[in-house]
Amino acid sequence: RANSHSNLELFTTLSHEGFPGHLYQTVFFGRTQPADIRYLITSGGYVEGWATYVESYGYQYAASLLTDKAASDLTALMWKNRCINLCIYSLLDTGIHYQGWNQTAALRFLQVFGIRDTKIASEIYQYIVETPCNYLKYYLGYLNFLDLKKKQQEKSGSSFDVREFHRKV
């Protein structure tokens, strides 16, 4: 399975961009017949948070289909790695745009997490400088969905229905 990593990437990208991600989200929204103004106003954290949240289900589902325990564990690890990257880039974004980090400070921060190649670190820095708050939409939005789910689980107890939760959010 030389291309199994690329298959996983395709599968989880489709989870994020297609169904149950943005495609589902957009079609569902359109079927609610919202006021026209709602098409002009959007919340990036909600939109990307939902897509990242359901992407996590894509990884979980992919892992559950694998009969090889090592491959299943690797798939779960890849989701954790994606979360860590989103978190690191979100923290870096906050450091640059809120705390005023220059490139040297940002590179030092990335080195703590093992990103030592200065060319790669510089590219990450430049991308975040040029797209402020981009990663925050994905990661904080995702964390907000996890918080909503946890609160609903606590409120509902044993009657919690994940499908109903997804329908409401």
Predicted features along the sequence, with ranges:
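Long, His/Glu/Asp-enriched segments that create or flank divalent metal/ion-associated functional microenvironments
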Residues: 1-169
